[in-house]
């Protein structure tokens, strides 16, 4: 896939065009690939080919590859006051000294299980985080974050 595995737990590696690999637990990695998760036609064939290639590469290991894009929903949180918004829904400290770019974690946010990670700065130089939650909790979490963001003008993005 053109991606390297992280060497430390709770971190990620990235290649802007190829995606992210997150080390989420001692025996689990999550790979976030660019593109439309509900693609059809050639795009879907390309995603299937990448999954097949990874499965073949791991065939000699005690490992499995599971495609979960339908299970998870993504939310991007960015802007000048995104930490203040986050602190309204979770107790996890995301100050840069504790959660620098390249970090990932699993925690609760507004009673929802989330996997979050901090990629590098956006193209406009603003820090951001990306969250994944179960699709069944996504609307609830998005609305809670949207409510918390109103007073700060923080941007939310569903993906």
Language-model features, listed with the residues they occupy:
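Basic, glycine/lysine-rich polyanion-binding surfaces/domains
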Residues: 1-159
